[in-house]
Amino acid sequence: MSHSSAPERATGAVITEWRPEDPAFWQQRGHRVASRNLWISVPCLLLAFCVWMLFSAVAVNLPKVGFNFTTDQLFMLTALPSVSGALLRVPYSFMVPLFGGCRWTAFSTGILIVPCVWLGFAVQDTSTPFSTFIIISLLCGFAGANFASSMANISFFFPKQKQGGALGLNGGLGNMGVSVMQLVAPLVVSLSIFAAFGSHGVEQPDGSQLYLANAAWIWVPFLAIFTLAAWFGMNELATSKASLKEQLPVLKRGHLWIMSLLYLATFGSFIGFSAGFAMLSKTQFPDVQILHYAFFGPFIGALARSAGGAISDRLGGTRVTLINFVLMAIFSGLLFLTLPTGGVGGSFIAFYGVFLALFLTAGLGSGSTFQMISVIFRKLTMDRVKAEGGSDERAMREAATDTAAALGFISAIGAIGGFFIPKAFGSSLALTGSPVGAMKVFLIFYIACVVITWAVYGRHSKNKK
């Protein structure tokens, strides 16, 4: 009898034997365990994205509750969580092999309660300095780092041929936290939900009350619930354990840096647009109540990410990624035609429609590039181990470890887009009064990614899967 059967029934326990590439093992035991861990991971990651992007909904409302921050400062608050999130993704990407997926998921979800509670109190006190908001926004970045450890953890549970779909679901539905937050926050800030905990509203010109603290506090009970779910419901895989020394060599691979650049263009665009879209829309079309519509772009992008992984499993990640970058460049060019000039003209409907297309392609590309990473690093590692005369078991174990480390590190690079995009919009507006300068940079970058994808991966059919 396998040693894995008992732990599979006892959630939260360590599974000492895990062979997802064995069809019989996968059918009889593996699929059930992997699915349970995936469906606990998804809401934990979704909540993390809610917290990570809190300031995309809070910053635009700060002037309404009495704070006199400049537009550039507000853009900065939306951008900073991506800085800390990107930096923290590097160590987070190595945490699962060091501490275990169950323990780390529970810990990394639970600590997000801290910035949520603090932000709720801070927005109710107009004497709160800008420096305090900077600290809170940086703490929200811990939520963004969860993506690296979550994706690394799930990658250990699934066989190679199912990783694109599994990572697409985990990442895509997790990314949906951005749209969930941008949908829920405008609704709950109009309700007196937490009066018993000190929440009070600020009267608006139309006589309504704005309870901005609710945008942060609404996530606290859910974070507590899913922290417990992760602790008691997920499993540790003994085969996923690896020292830091075993994981670091992946940083020497040239493909790591190439794929980091491509992922920056896809996921970086998704998270950057998610962070900055509401503020950008407010500056270009001030009469539009953008928070009524802001959630839909991230929602489409999150769904597209799930689809991007599954489509890439069938058609090949390189092919999907290449076509996707062409579309991103086209839509970026179209965006110039939708903007007002000197505050005159422009079409919000066209602007919104083109941005939805950009969210869609950014989401698809996030899924397809992650599928490429998984395929590329598994093949590189297995070929290396076999060339050294290693066993199939060693090859599969090291391939899983290298792939998880690569996924985590590359996700850290991608998250930087969440800082650069809103900061680029803010700087362009401050210097020229228009976001056009930033948009030109994005367009050139997407065109460069088309060339890089084709030159490195697209010319050789053996790399297309």
Annotate each predicted stretch with a short phrase.
Residues 36-67, 181, 273-278, 421:
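Extracytoplasmic
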Residues 55-60, 253-302, 306, 366, ...:
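Extracytoplasmic gate region of multi-pass secondary transporters
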Residues 76-94, 295-308:
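Central cavity-lining transmembrane alpha-helices of secondary-active solute carriers
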Residues 87-130:
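Conserved MFS/SLC helix-loop-helix module at the cytosolic interface between two early adjacent transmembrane helices
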Residues 110-126, 326-345:
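C-terminal ends and interior cores of transmembrane alpha-helices
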Residues 115, 129-145, 346-366:
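Hydrophobic core of transmembrane alpha-helices in multi-pass small-molecule transporters
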Residues 144, 164-190, 407-421:
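Glycine-rich segments within core transmembrane alpha-helices of 12-TM secondary carriers
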Residues 190, 218-240, 452-456:
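C-terminal membrane-cytosol helix-exit motif in multi-pass small-molecule transporters
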